[in-house]
Protein backbone atom coordinates (compact mmCIF):
# COMPACT_ATOMS: atom_id res chain seq x y z
CA UNK A 1 0.00 0.00 0.00
CA UNK A 2 1.38 3.40 -1.03
CA UNK A 3 0.08 6.88 -0.21
CA UNK A 4 0.69 9.97 -2.38
CA UNK A 5 -0.83 13.35 -1.46
CA UNK A 6 -3.29 11.65 0.85
CA UNK A 7 -4.49 9.22 -1.85
CA UNK A 8 -3.93 5.53 -1.27
CA UNK A 9 -2.63 3.21 -4.00
CA UNK A 10 -2.58 -0.59 -3.91
CA UNK A 11 1.01 -0.83 -5.22
CA UNK A 12 2.25 2.58 -6.33
CA UNK A 13 0.88 5.49 -8.34
CA UNK A 14 2.52 4.41 -11.61
CA UNK A 15 1.66 0.71 -11.29
CA UNK A 16 -1.95 1.42 -10.32
CA UNK A 17 -2.28 3.89 -13.21
CA UNK A 18 -0.94 1.26 -15.62
CA UNK A 19 -3.46 -1.39 -14.55
CA UNK A 20 -6.25 1.18 -14.57
CA UNK A 21 -5.31 2.09 -18.15
CA UNK A 22 -5.33 -1.57 -19.19
CA UNK A 23 -8.77 -2.07 -17.62
CA UNK A 24 -10.18 1.07 -19.25
CA UNK A 25 -8.74 -0.04 -22.59
CA UNK A 26 -10.42 -3.43 -22.20
CA UNK A 27 -13.76 -1.75 -21.47
CA UNK A 28 -13.26 0.51 -24.49
CA UNK A 29 -12.72 -2.49 -26.79
CA UNK A 30 -15.74 -4.33 -25.35
CA UNK A 31 -17.87 -1.24 -25.85
CA UNK A 32 -16.67 -0.98 -29.46
CA UNK A 33 -17.84 -4.51 -30.29
CA UNK A 34 -21.19 -3.85 -28.62
CA UNK A 35 -21.72 -0.60 -30.51
CA UNK A 36 -20.37 -1.87 -33.85
CA UNK A 37 -23.11 -4.47 -34.30
CA UNK A 38 -26.09 -2.36 -33.27
CA UNK A 39 -27.95 0.21 -35.36
CA UNK A 40 -27.66 2.87 -36.59
CA UNK A 41 -24.78 1.99 -38.91
CA UNK A 42 -23.10 5.11 -40.22
CA UNK A 43 -22.00 3.63 -43.55
CA UNK A 44 -21.54 7.00 -45.23
CA UNK A 45 -19.20 8.20 -42.48
CA UNK A 46 -17.24 4.92 -42.64
CA UNK A 47 -16.79 5.36 -46.41
CA UNK A 48 -15.75 8.99 -45.93
CA UNK A 49 -13.17 7.96 -43.34
CA UNK A 50 -11.87 5.19 -45.63
CA UNK A 51 -11.33 7.68 -48.45
CA UNK A 52 -9.67 10.14 -46.08
CA UNK A 53 -7.32 7.49 -44.70
CA UNK A 54 -6.46 6.27 -48.20
CA UNK A 55 -5.83 9.72 -49.63
CA UNK A 56 -3.75 10.77 -46.62
CA UNK A 57 -1.48 7.74 -46.86
CA UNK A 58 -1.38 6.80 -50.54
CA UNK A 59 1.47 9.03 -51.70
CA UNK A 60 3.70 8.21 -48.72
CA UNK A 61 3.00 4.47 -49.00
CA UNK A 62 3.76 4.57 -52.73
CA UNK A 63 7.11 6.26 -52.21
CA UNK A 64 8.09 4.20 -49.17
CA UNK A 65 6.99 0.88 -50.69
CA UNK A 66 8.99 1.53 -53.87
CA UNK A 67 12.11 2.51 -51.90
CA UNK A 68 11.80 -0.54 -49.63
CA UNK A 69 11.59 -2.79 -52.69
CA UNK A 70 14.67 -1.22 -54.29
CA UNK A 71 16.79 -1.12 -51.12
CA UNK A 72 15.89 -4.61 -49.90
CA UNK A 73 16.72 -6.04 -53.34
CA UNK A 74 20.06 -4.23 -53.41
CA UNK A 75 20.93 -5.46 -49.91
CA UNK A 76 19.93 -9.06 -50.65
CA UNK A 77 21.83 -9.42 -53.94
CA UNK A 78 25.41 -9.69 -52.50
CA UNK A 79 24.39 -12.44 -50.07
CA UNK A 80 22.74 -14.48 -52.82
CA UNK A 81 25.67 -13.89 -55.19
CA UNK A 82 28.05 -15.41 -52.65
CA UNK A 83 26.03 -18.64 -52.86
CA UNK A 84 25.48 -18.43 -56.62
CA UNK A 85 21.73 -18.07 -56.10
CA UNK A 86 20.94 -14.70 -57.66
CA UNK A 87 18.14 -16.33 -59.66
CA UNK A 88 16.28 -16.77 -56.37
CA UNK A 89 16.18 -13.01 -55.77
CA UNK A 90 12.64 -12.46 -57.19
CA UNK A 91 11.33 -15.36 -55.09
CA UNK A 92 12.98 -13.98 -51.97
CA UNK A 93 11.50 -10.54 -52.57
CA UNK A 94 8.04 -11.92 -53.27
CA UNK A 95 8.02 -13.91 -50.04
CA UNK A 96 9.58 -11.15 -47.90
CA UNK A 97 7.30 -8.39 -49.15
CA UNK A 98 4.10 -10.43 -49.01
CA UNK A 99 4.77 -12.08 -45.66
CA UNK A 100 6.21 -9.19 -43.69
CA UNK A 101 7.30 -5.96 -45.34
CA UNK A 102 4.01 -4.98 -47.00
CA UNK A 103 1.75 -5.13 -43.91
CA UNK A 104 4.46 -3.90 -41.54
CA UNK A 105 5.56 -0.86 -43.57
CA UNK A 106 1.95 0.12 -44.25
CA UNK A 107 0.89 -0.16 -40.62
CA UNK A 108 3.88 1.82 -39.33
CA UNK A 109 3.18 4.62 -41.80
CA UNK A 110 -0.51 4.66 -40.90
CA UNK A 111 0.26 4.53 -37.16
CA UNK A 112 2.22 7.76 -37.50
CA UNK A 113 0.06 9.54 -40.04
CA UNK A 114 -3.49 8.24 -39.61
CA UNK A 115 -3.26 7.32 -35.93
CA UNK A 116 -1.96 10.72 -34.90
CA UNK A 117 -4.66 12.41 -36.97
CA UNK A 118 -7.47 10.40 -35.35
CA UNK A 119 -6.13 10.94 -31.85
CA UNK A 120 -5.60 14.67 -32.37
CA UNK A 121 -9.04 15.14 -33.93
CA UNK A 122 -10.94 13.29 -31.19
CA UNK A 123 -8.76 14.87 -28.50
CA UNK A 124 -9.52 18.36 -29.78
CA UNK A 125 -13.23 17.56 -29.83
CA UNK A 126 -12.98 16.24 -26.27
CA UNK A 127 -11.20 19.22 -24.73
CA UNK A 128 -13.44 21.72 -26.57
CA UNK A 129 -16.51 19.82 -25.24
CA UNK A 130 -17.84 18.99 -28.71
CA UNK A 131 -18.25 15.36 -27.65
CA UNK A 132 -20.28 16.46 -24.61
CA UNK A 133 -22.42 18.61 -26.92
CA UNK A 134 -23.14 15.56 -29.11
CA UNK A 135 -24.31 13.61 -26.06
CA UNK A 136 -26.61 16.47 -25.05
CA UNK A 137 -28.01 16.46 -28.61
CA UNK A 138 -28.93 12.76 -28.25
CA UNK A 139 -26.17 11.70 -30.69
CA UNK A 140 -24.04 8.74 -29.68
CA UNK A 141 -20.50 10.16 -30.05
CA UNK A 142 -18.87 6.78 -29.51
CA UNK A 143 -20.71 5.18 -32.40
CA UNK A 144 -20.35 8.16 -34.74
CA UNK A 145 -16.74 9.09 -33.94
CA UNK A 146 -15.04 5.94 -32.67
CA UNK A 147 -16.79 3.02 -34.38
CA UNK A 148 -16.64 4.64 -37.81
CA UNK A 149 -12.92 5.42 -37.56
CA UNK A 150 -11.95 2.00 -36.22
CA UNK A 151 -13.98 0.30 -38.95
CA UNK A 152 -12.35 2.57 -41.54
CA UNK A 153 -8.80 1.74 -40.44
CA UNK A 154 -9.64 -1.97 -40.29
CA UNK A 155 -10.95 -1.85 -43.87
CA UNK A 156 -8.46 0.58 -45.41
CA UNK A 157 -5.13 -0.70 -44.10
CA UNK A 158 -5.45 -4.21 -45.66
CA UNK A 159 -6.13 -2.56 -49.03
CA UNK A 160 -3.18 -0.21 -48.58
CA UNK A 161 -1.05 -3.15 -47.45
CA UNK A 162 -1.57 -5.11 -50.66
CA UNK A 163 -0.98 -1.93 -52.64
CA UNK A 164 2.29 -1.40 -50.76
CA UNK A 165 3.31 -4.99 -51.54
CA UNK A 166 2.60 -4.39 -55.22
CA UNK A 167 4.63 -1.17 -55.26
CA UNK A 168 7.45 -2.92 -53.38
CA UNK A 169 7.60 -5.61 -56.06
CA UNK A 170 7.66 -2.90 -58.73
CA UNK A 171 10.65 -1.36 -56.97
CA UNK A 172 12.31 -4.77 -56.76
CA UNK A 173 11.76 -5.40 -60.47
CA UNK A 174 13.17 -1.96 -61.26
CA UNK A 175 16.39 -2.85 -59.46
CA UNK A 176 16.61 -6.38 -60.92
CA UNK A 177 16.00 -5.15 -64.48
CA UNK A 178 18.76 -2.57 -64.10
CA UNK A 179 21.26 -5.18 -62.91
CA UNK A 180 20.45 -7.95 -65.38
CA UNK A 181 18.30 -8.71 -68.41
CA UNK A 182 15.16 -10.05 -66.74
CA UNK A 183 11.75 -9.71 -68.35
CA UNK A 184 8.70 -8.69 -66.36
CA UNK A 185 7.05 -12.03 -67.11
CA UNK A 186 9.98 -14.03 -65.74
CA UNK A 187 10.26 -11.81 -62.66
CA UNK A 188 6.55 -12.13 -61.84
CA UNK A 189 6.63 -15.90 -62.38
CA UNK A 190 9.57 -16.32 -60.01
CA UNK A 191 8.21 -13.83 -57.47
CA UNK A 192 4.79 -15.45 -57.16
CA UNK A 193 5.73 -19.12 -57.57
CA UNK A 194 6.63 -19.64 -53.91
CA UNK A 195 3.86 -17.47 -52.44
CA UNK A 196 1.23 -19.76 -50.96
CA UNK A 197 -2.36 -19.14 -49.95
CA UNK A 198 -1.20 -19.20 -46.33
CA UNK A 199 1.18 -16.30 -47.06
CA UNK A 200 -1.64 -14.22 -48.55
CA UNK A 201 -4.01 -15.13 -45.72
CA UNK A 202 -1.37 -14.30 -43.10
CA UNK A 203 -0.65 -10.96 -44.78
CA UNK A 204 -4.36 -10.12 -44.79
CA UNK A 205 -4.74 -11.17 -41.15
CA UNK A 206 -1.79 -9.02 -40.11
CA UNK A 207 -3.18 -5.99 -41.94
CA UNK A 208 -6.63 -6.44 -40.39
CA UNK A 209 -5.19 -6.77 -36.88
CA UNK A 210 -2.84 -3.81 -37.37
CA UNK A 211 -5.64 -1.67 -38.79
CA UNK A 212 -7.91 -2.45 -35.86
CA UNK A 213 -5.09 -1.77 -33.40
CA UNK A 214 -4.27 1.63 -34.89
CA UNK A 215 -7.92 2.66 -34.95
CA UNK A 216 -8.84 1.49 -31.45
CA UNK A 217 -5.68 2.80 -29.73
CA UNK A 218 -5.82 6.20 -31.45
CA UNK A 219 -9.53 6.58 -30.74
CA UNK A 220 -9.09 5.55 -27.10
CA UNK A 221 -6.29 8.04 -26.47
CA UNK A 222 -8.12 10.86 -28.22
CA UNK A 223 -11.53 10.11 -26.71
CA UNK A 224 -10.17 10.42 -23.17
CA UNK A 225 -7.74 13.30 -23.71
CA UNK A 226 -7.67 15.89 -20.90
CA UNK A 227 -5.88 19.07 -19.81
CA UNK A 228 -6.41 21.18 -22.93
CA UNK A 229 -4.13 21.34 -25.95
CA UNK A 230 -1.19 19.98 -23.98
CA UNK A 231 -3.23 16.90 -23.16
CA UNK A 232 -4.14 16.48 -26.83
CA UNK A 233 -0.47 16.50 -27.79
CA UNK A 234 0.34 13.98 -25.07
CA UNK A 235 -2.53 11.71 -26.13
CA UNK A 236 -1.42 11.86 -29.77
CA UNK A 237 2.15 10.97 -28.85
CA UNK A 238 1.01 8.08 -26.66
CA UNK A 239 -1.31 6.79 -29.40
CA UNK A 240 1.51 6.57 -31.95
CA UNK A 241 4.00 4.96 -29.54
CA UNK A 242 1.51 2.41 -28.19
CA UNK A 243 0.25 1.54 -31.68
CA UNK A 244 3.77 0.87 -32.97
CA UNK A 245 4.63 -1.22 -29.89
CA UNK A 246 1.48 -3.33 -30.25
CA UNK A 247 2.07 -3.76 -33.99
CA UNK A 248 5.51 -5.28 -33.38
CA UNK A 249 4.14 -7.44 -30.57
CA UNK A 250 1.31 -8.69 -32.80
CA UNK A 251 3.83 -9.32 -35.60
CA UNK A 252 5.78 -11.70 -33.37
CA UNK A 253 2.63 -13.51 -32.21
CA UNK A 254 1.11 -13.89 -35.69
CA UNK A 255 4.42 -15.09 -37.19
CA UNK A 256 4.67 -17.76 -34.50
CA UNK A 257 1.10 -18.92 -35.15
CA UNK A 258 1.58 -18.97 -38.94
CA UNK A 259 4.84 -20.92 -38.65
CA UNK A 260 3.12 -23.41 -36.36
CA UNK A 261 0.36 -23.86 -38.97
CA UNK A 262 2.88 -24.05 -41.83
CA UNK A 263 4.88 -26.87 -40.27
CA UNK A 264 2.03 -28.63 -38.47
Which stretches of residues belong to each language-model region?
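Hydrophobic alpha-helical transmembrane segments of multi-pass membrane transport proteins
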Residues: 89-132, 217
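Membrane-interfacial helix-loop-helix connectors in multipass membrane proteins
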Residues: 75-98, 165-208, 216-236, 257-264
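Short cytoplasmic-facing helical segments at TM-TM junctions of multi-pass membrane proteins
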Residues: 122-147, 229-232
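Selective transmembrane-helix segments that form parts of the transport pathway or gating/packing helices
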Residues: 54, 58, 62, 101, ...
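Hydrophobic alpha-helical transmembrane segments that constitute the membrane-spanning cores
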Residues: 64-67, 147-176, 217, 250, ...
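Active-site cofactor/substrate anionic-group-binding motifs, chiefly glycine-
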Residues: 53-105, 109
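Short hydrophobic alpha-helical segments within the ABC transporter permease transmembrane module
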Residues: 93, 97, 137, 141-155, ...
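Short, membrane-interfacial amphipathic segments enriched in basic
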Residues: 2-44, 221-226
Amino acid sequence: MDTVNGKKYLFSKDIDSYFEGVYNGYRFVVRFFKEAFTSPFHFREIINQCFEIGLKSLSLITLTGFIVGVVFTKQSRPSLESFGAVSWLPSLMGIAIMRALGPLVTSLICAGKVGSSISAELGSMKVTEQIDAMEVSAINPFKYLVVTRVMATTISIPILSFYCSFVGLVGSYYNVSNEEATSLQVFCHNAFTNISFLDIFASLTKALVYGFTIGIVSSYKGFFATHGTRGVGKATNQAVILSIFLIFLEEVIIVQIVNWIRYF
